[in-house]
Amino acid sequence: MSRLLGGTLERVCKAVLLLCLLHFLVAVILYFDVYAQHLAFFSRFSIRSPAHALYPAASSSTNCSRPNATASSSGLPEVPSARPGPTAPVIPPCPDVPPGLVGRVVIEFTSPMPLERVQRENPGVLLGGRYTPPDCTPAQTVAVIIPFRHREHHLRYWLHYLHPMLRRQRLRYGIYVINQHGEETFNRAKLLNVGFLEALKEDATYDCFIFSDVDLVPMDDRNLYRCGDQPRHFAIAMDKFGFRLPYASYFGGVSGLSKAQFLRINGFPNEYWGWGGEDDDIFNRISLTGMKISRPDVRIGRYRMIKHDRDKHNEPNPQRFSKIQNTKLSMKWDGIGSLRYRVLEVSRQPLFTNITVDIGRPMSWLNQG
């Protein structure tokens, strides 16, 4: 009996031992399987986000790197590869009333005026007579157009006084001297038309055009060379006329039109050869298109004229009075749309751009441009 009981206990102990061994093996297998899963998880996390330990996690509604950053597929923010550099300073717009104006300026034409001196006085002016103020952004880009022939002496004085004045006015501008080639009869208005087109060829952003005789110098820098809602007449009080407007419709000397205003009147007439008449024709064009003349205060719009004799081949135009009477008809076909000329040379000088052109002669269409 005892022998039978001992055999039974031995078999039970062996069975328990086998069960314990089986349980141990199952536990070991499960342990290594869980360990492998954890190792794979942390390996993937380390590859995707190597810099995670250096940057704290951000909430889903906040991005601390840059406004356009996006979250990764794991829900964690992506770390930028490089931080953005400093932004360029914003240049403010130029004020309506420039702070550096001096008002009335003493003008004299007795001292010698070499171009080298004028160039030294205006170091900020770039080749071709271009200037942009460094401390503000102007609202307009201004082209100053000068009809010209054989007036080098006058031009030096004009540049001497005008460059500093235009810089004080905080203008972005360029100076264009339109030089009529040859000795045919002078045609001021046609040269101004040429200047309008040639300036736009160089810089299509020009939106204001100042047309100035080379012998007229403003006496007050508060006479701002800008364009407004209406065509502007600047030279309203010349010493030549006793500092008074000679007549109500006078539009001579120095005037300004925006690009849109100039095109609205079909530019200036091309058929006024010789002295006189074209200014009155331009006034008629402005009136006929429903615009009005804007002028500065008479105390500000004062000018000095450099005295000179009448130019050869610029005699008074005997047809000017009859032409003025027909502006309503002639402005439709005579103007910027019918302009013909030929550019002979473009020379960019330190203080201005010289454009020499062949504009033909009276009753001639030989200049095909």
UniProtKB/Swiss-Prot annotation:
Protein name listed in UniProt: Beta-1,4-galactosyltransferase 2
One record GO biological process: cerebellar Purkinje cell layer development
Source organism of this protein record: Cricetulus griseus (Chinese hamster)
PANTHER family: BETA-1,4-GALACTOSYLTRANSFERASE, BETA-1,4-GALACTOSYLTRANSFERASE 2
Residue numbers binding UDP-alpha-D-galactose: 147-151, 186-188, 214-215, 275, 308-310
Binding-site residues for N-acetyl-D-glucosamine, renumbered to this chain: 277-280, 320
UniProtKB keywords: Disulfide bond, Glycoprotein, Glycosyltransferase, Golgi apparatus, Manganese, Membrane, Metal-binding, Signal-anchor, Transferase, Transmembrane, Transmembrane helix
Requisite cofactors: Mn(2+)
This protein's encoding gene: B4GALT2
Keyword Transmembrane: yes
Catalytic activity: D-glucose + UDP-alpha-D-galactose = lactose + UDP + H(+); an N-acetyl-beta-D-glucosaminyl derivative + UDP-alpha-D-galactose = a beta-D-galactosyl-(1->4)-N-acetyl-beta-D-glucosaminyl derivative + UDP + H(+); N-acetyl-D-glucosamine + UDP-alpha-D-galactose = beta-D-galactosyl-(1->4)-N-acetyl-D-glucosamine + UDP + H(+)
Gene3D superfamilies given in the database record: Spore Coat Polysaccharide Biosynthesis Protein SpsA, Chain A (3.90.550.10)
One protein family per Pfam: Glyco_transf_7C
Glycan attachment sites: 63, 68, 354
Broad class of where this protein is predominantly found: Golgi
Cytoplasmic membrane side: 1-15
